[in-house]
C-alpha cells in the first residue's frame, strides 16, 4: 500500500459581535423568533441601498492584526452570485480580489515544535439566512427559511494548505478561536453558529509536491466533527486511489450520526460565482493611522500571555498553554494568583479538579459556580493546616455543586484536620499493632509498605489526620 499524506486548508467563518448588521441597522441578537430581526435591506427588497457599518471594518482589522495579517490600504466589496433559498438577493455581498487583509499566520504546537500555519486572506462578507430542515439535510421533505441571520457581519479566514492531519486542523481551529476571542470581536460559539468551518482536503503520495484533487466538507459544527470528518474523508480518498479510482472534486456534507461524508454537489470555482464589484458600495480607503490606533488597542494575545506565564510564574509550557486557551480561563487564574501568590498550586487545582468538573457538567468557566475568591479561601485553609489536601478535594466538589464557601462546608461537616499529636499517635499505635507483617516489610526496605500504613491511619480518621504528622509518627515508631 502506497504511503499518502493529507493536505488540508480551512475556511473559517466568524460572526462579528456588533450590535447591528453589516449593511443595515437590524439587530444581530441571537435566538429571536424566525424572521423578526429583518428589514428591507437584509431581505433584499427592491429600492433599498446598503450602507457599510464602520464597526465591522474596525473589527475585521482588529482580527486581522491579531492574526499577523497585512492590512490593505484599498479594499472593495463584490457581489458573489448564486441561487439558494437562504440568499434573498440571489447574491451575497463579499470581497473577491481586494480583501481587507492578506498574508497572516498563527502558530500551533506539533510534536513539541512550533509550526506556522499561513493565512492566505481575511475578508468581510454578509451572512446568509438559515435553512431549517425537517429531518436531516439528505432526507428532509421540505425546508423552512429564517432570515434573521441574513446580513449578520462575517469575516472569512482562509488558511494556506499547510495542515497535514486532522489533529493539526483541530489545533489550528482551537488556536484561531482563542485569538479571536481574546480580541473581543466575536464570542466564537460554535453551538450558536458564530464560528463555522469548511474544510478542503486532498491526499497525495508522500514526498510529492503536486496537489491531489480536493473535496470540500461542510456541516462541521464542532472541533470533534472537524477531526472525525477529516479522518474519514482522508481514508475514503486513499481507498478510492488504492482501488484505481479517481477522486471527484465536489462538496460533501458530514453526517454526524453515520460518521461519514456524503456528496452534496460538484465543487464550484470562482468563475461560477461571476464576481463583480458591488455598484452600491464605494471602495474602502483604509487610513494607516486608524490601523495603528487599532493595533495599539489590542490586548495581550494567547502566545504573549503564555510566554509571560512561563517567565513570570515559572509555569511549565503545558500549564501555560492550557491556562491561556481562553481569555476567561486566564482571567480566572490571574484573579486567583492575586489572592494566593503560589501560581503552580493554583494551576494544579484549576487544571485538575476545576476543569474536570467543568467538562463533566459541560459548563463554561465564566459560569463556574466556584469564584476565584472562593478557591483562594479554600487554598488558605490547606495552607493553615485546617484541612488536608485530600479533604480539600471533597470540600471543592461540594463548593462546585452548591456554590457555598469552603469555611461553611468544613464547619458544617466537621472536616477540620486533626493535628493533635497525641490523638494521632494513639491511632498510629493501633495500626502498627494490627499490621505486623506490613511493619516488617517496611523495616526490610519496602517503602510502599509505609504508604499502606498511612492509608490505614487516614481511613481510621476518615481522612482528617494531618498526613505529614502521620508520616513522621509512623517512621519514628517503626
From Swiss-Prot:
Q: Which molecular-function annotations from GO does this UniProt entry contain?
A: asparaginyl-tRNA synthase (glutamine-hydrolyzing) activity; ATP binding; glutaminyl-tRNA synthase (glutamine-hydrolyzing) activity
Matching entries from InterPro entries are given as:
Asn/Gln-tRNA_amidoTrfase_suB/E (IPR017959), Asn/Gln-tRNA_Trfase_suB/E_cat (IPR006075), Asn/Gln_amidotransferase (IPR018027), Asn/Gln_tRNA_amidoTrase-B-like (IPR003789), GatB (IPR004413), GatB_C_1 (IPR042114), GatB_Yqey_C_2 (IPR023168), Gln-tRNA_amidoTrfase_suB_CS (IPR017958)
Gene3D superfamilies, sorted: 1.10.10.410, GatB domain, N-terminal subdomain
GO terms, biological process: glutaminyl-tRNAGln biosynthesis via transamidation; translation
Q: Does the keyword Nucleotide-binding apply?
A: yes
- Record's keyword terms, sorted: ATP-binding, Ligase, Nucleotide-binding, Protein biosynthesis
Task: Please give the coiled-coil regions recorded for this protein.
Answer: none
Give the domain of life.
Bacteria
Query: Which SUPFAM superfamilies does the record match to this protein?
Result: GatB/YqeY motif, Glutamine synthetase/guanido kinase
This enzyme catalyses: L-glutamyl-tRNA(Gln) + L-glutamine + ATP + H2O = L-glutaminyl-tRNA(Gln) + L-glutamate + ADP + phosphate + H(+); L-aspartyl-tRNA(Asn) + L-glutamine + ATP + H2O = L-asparaginyl-tRNA(Asn) + L-glutamate + ADP + phosphate + 2 H(+)
Q: What is its EC number?
A: 6.3.5.-
Q: Sum up the protein's function in the record's words.
A: Allows the formation of correctly charged Asn-tRNA(Asn) or Gln-tRNA(Gln) through the transamidation of misacylated Asp-tRNA(Asn) or Glu-tRNA(Gln) in organisms which lack either or both of asparaginyl-tRNA or glutaminyl-tRNA synthetases. The reaction takes place in the presence of glutamine and ATP through an activated phospho-Asp-tRNA(Asn) or phospho-Glu-tRNA(Gln).
Family per UniProt? Belongs to the GatB/GatE family. GatB subfamily.
Q: What is this protein called?
A: Aspartyl/glutamyl-tRNA(Asn/Gln) amidotransferase subunit B
Q: From which source organism is this entry?
A: Pelotomaculum thermopropionicum (strain DSM 13744 / JCM 10971 / SI)
Amino acid at each position: 500500500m502506497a504511503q499518502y499524506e493529507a493536505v488540508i486548508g480551512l475556511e473559517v467563518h466568524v460572526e462579528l459581535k456588533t450590535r447591528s448588521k453589516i449593511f443595515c441597522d437590524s439587530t444581530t441578537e441571537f435566538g429571536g423568533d424566525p424572521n423578526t430581526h429583518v428589514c428591507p435591506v437584509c431581505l433584499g427588497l427592491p429600492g433599498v441601498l446598503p450602507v457599510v457599518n464602520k464597526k465591522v471594518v474596525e473589527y475585521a482589522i482588529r482580527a486581522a492584526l491579531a492574526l499577523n495579517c497585512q492590512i490593505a490600504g484599498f479594499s472593495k466589496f463584490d457581489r458573489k452570485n448564486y441561487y439558494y433559498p437562504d440568499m434573498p438577493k440571489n447574491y451575497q455581498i463579499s470581497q473577491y480580489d481586494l480583501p481587507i487583509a492578506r498574508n497572516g499566520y498563527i502558530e500551533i504546537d506539533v510534536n513539541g515544535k512550533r509550526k506556522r500555519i499561513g493565512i492566505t486572506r481575511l475578508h468581510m462578507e454578509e451572512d446568509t439566512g438559515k435553512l431549517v430542515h425537517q429531518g436531516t439535510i439528505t432526507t428532509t421533505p421540505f425546508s423552512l427559511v429564517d432570515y434573521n441571520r441574513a446580513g449578520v457581519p462575517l469575516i472569512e479566514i482562509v488558511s494556506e494548505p499547510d495542515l497535514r492531519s486532522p489533529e493539526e486542523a483541530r489545533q489550528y481551529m482551537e488556536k484561531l478561536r482563542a485569538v479571536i476571542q481574546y480580541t473581543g470581536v466575536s464570542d466564537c460559539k460554535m453551538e450558536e453558529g458564530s464560528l463555522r468551518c469548511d474544510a478542503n482536503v486532498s491526499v497525495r503520495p508522500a514526498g510529492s509536491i503536486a496537489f491531489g484533487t480536493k473535496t470540500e466538507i461542510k456541516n462541521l459544527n464542532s472541533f470533534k466533527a472537524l477531526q472525525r470528518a477529516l479522518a474519514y474523508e482522508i481514508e475514503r480518498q486513499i481507498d478510492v486511489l488504492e482501488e484505481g479510482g479517481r477522486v471527484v472534486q465536489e462538496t460533501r456534507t458530514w453526517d454526524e450520526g453515520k460518521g461519514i461524508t456524503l456528496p452534496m454537489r460538484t465543487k464550484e470555482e470562482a468563475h461560477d460565482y461571476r464576481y463583480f464589484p458591488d455598484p452600491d458600495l464605494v471602495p474602502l480607503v483604509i487610513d494607516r493611522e486608524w490601523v495603528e490606533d487599532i493595533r495599539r488597542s489590542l490586548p495581550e494575545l494567547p502566545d504573549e500571555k503564555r510566554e509571560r506565564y512561563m517567565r513570570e510564574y515559572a509555569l511549565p509550557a503545558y500549564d501555560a498553554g492550557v491556562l491561556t486557551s481562553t481569555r476567561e480561563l486566564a482571567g480566572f487564574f490571574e484573579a486567583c494568583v492575586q489572592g494566593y501568590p503560589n501560581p503552580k498550586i493554583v494551576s494544579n487545582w484549576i487544571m485538575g479538579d476545576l476543569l474536570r468538573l467543568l467538562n463533566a457538567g459541560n459548563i463554561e468557566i465564566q459560569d463556574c459556580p466556584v469564584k476565584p475568591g472562593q478557591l483562594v479561601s479554600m487554598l488558605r485553609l490547606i495552607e493553615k493546616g485546617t484541612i488536608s489536601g485530600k479533604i480539600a478535594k471533597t470540600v471543592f466538589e461540594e463548593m462546585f455543586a452548591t456554590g457555598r464557601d469552603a469555611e461553611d462546608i468544613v464547619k458544617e461537616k466537621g472536616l477540620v484536620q486533626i493535628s493533635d499529636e497525641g490523638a494521632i499517635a494513639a491511632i498510629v499505635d493501633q495500626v502498627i499493632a494490627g499490621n505486623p507483617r506490613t511493619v516488617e516489610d517496611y523495616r526490610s526496605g519496602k517503602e510502599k509498605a509505609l504508604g499502606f500504613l498511612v492509608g490505614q491511619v487516614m481511613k481510621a480518621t476518615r481522612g482528617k489526620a494531618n498526613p505529614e504528622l502521620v508520616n513522621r509518627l509512623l517512621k519514628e515508631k517503626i
